[in-house]
Amino acid sequence: KRALQSEKRRQHNASRRSMTRTYLKKVIAAIASGDKAAATAAFAVAQPIMDRMATKGLIHKNKAARHKSRLS
């Protein structure tokens, strides 16, 4: 039972981590394109997701803070 739970949790966490990285890539792509409005909008969407992942323990809170600081 524990092995099944662990595998299910691992897949769920991998999905969440991938989603987080995707949102970060969208922000970076918007910044690289030079579109300030799109970059601001993408950052506004990505910021609460980073906070949520840090709260749930998927990424360290300092890592979330570092990403937000570098992107803002």
UniProtKB/Swiss-Prot annotation:
InterPro entries: Ribosomal_bS20, Ribosomal_bS20_sf. GO terms for molecular function: small ribosomal subunit rRNA binding; structural constituent of ribosome. GO terms for cellular component: cytosol; small ribosomal subunit. One of its GO terms (biological process) is translation. SUPFAM superfamilies: Ribosomal protein S20 (SSF46992). Keywords: Ribonucleoprotein, Ribosomal protein, RNA-binding, rRNA-binding. Binds directly to 16S ribosomal RNA. NCBIfam families: S20 (TIGR00029). Belongs to the bacterial ribosomal protein bS20 family. This is Small ribosomal subunit protein bS20. It comes from Aeromonas hydrophila. The lineage of its organism: Bacteria, Pseudomonadati, Pseudomonadota, Gammaproteobacteria, Aeromonadales.
